[in-house]
């Protein structure tokens, strides 16, 4: 693990008020790992080819975690985390800095690009705070790859707060 802790994106996402239950996940992983006599966790360690070769593994599993994809959309990279265009990391940093209190969200238009788990988490934050939310995805269904429980709660949230959904839709440009 190249970071000083395990848990990956879940430790960051757990800063969202509706996701605080995830804060215990890294502790759970550590407790499980501690019971396994044949598992070693190296923190603050980059998984280089030379480092992996030192272990002489029979099997290698690439479990590199989740990093938000920044697709090659005109104007996107230039505007990320500058102003009103955020990755999930920028959005959570703004939440933690107090930039999105409930009164600031009322009536704001929020467009989420990507209907996967992270996009659904963003909607779950803004919709109950009175934002006018829209979610778009290139797939034919929002939350298409989500588990059944997430799909059920997503549908409930989207219906309750009037979240607009656009499927088979791709963002072309950010201005």
Specify the residue positions occupied by each region the protein language model found.
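Residues in the short beta-alpha loop(s) of Rossmann-like NAD(P)-binding domains
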Residues: 2-3, 139
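Short acidic/His/Gly/Ser-rich catalytic and metal-binding motifs that mark active-site loops
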Residues: 6-10, 70-71
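Short glycine-enriched, charge-decorated loop/helix-capping segments at active-site entrances
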Residues: 14-19
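A Rossmann-like FAD-binding core segment of flavoenzymes
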Residues: 23-69, 83-108, 128-175
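Glycine-rich Rossmann-fold phosphate-binding loop(s) that bind the pyrophosphate
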Residues: 114-116
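N-terminal Rossmann-fold NAD(P) dinucleotide-binding loop
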Residues: 119-120
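Generic hydrophobic/aromatic pocket-lining and core-packing "Φ" positions
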Residues: 123-124
């Amino acid at each position: 693990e190249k970071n000083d802790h395990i848990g990956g994106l879940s430790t960051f996402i757990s800063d969202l008020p509706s996701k605080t239950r995830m804060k215990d996940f890294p502790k759970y992983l550590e407790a499980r790992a501690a019971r396994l006599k044949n598992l070693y966790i190296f923190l603050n360690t980059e998984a280089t080819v030379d480092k992996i070769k030192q272990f002489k593994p029979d099997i290698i599993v690439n479990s590199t975690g989740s990093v938000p994809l920044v697709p090659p959309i005109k104007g996107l990279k230039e505007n990320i985390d500058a102003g009103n265009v955020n990755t999930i990391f920028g959005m959570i940093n703004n939440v933690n800095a107090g930039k999105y209190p409930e009164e600031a969200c009322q009536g704001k238009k929020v467009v989420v690009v990507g209907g996967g788990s992270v996009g659904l988490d963003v909607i779950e934050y803004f919709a109950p705070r009175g934002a006018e939310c829209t979610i778009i995805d290139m797939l034919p269904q929002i939350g298409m790859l989500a588990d059944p429980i997430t799909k059920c709660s997503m549908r409930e949230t989207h219906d309750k707060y009037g979240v607009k959904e656009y499927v088979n839709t791709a963002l072309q440009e950010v201005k």
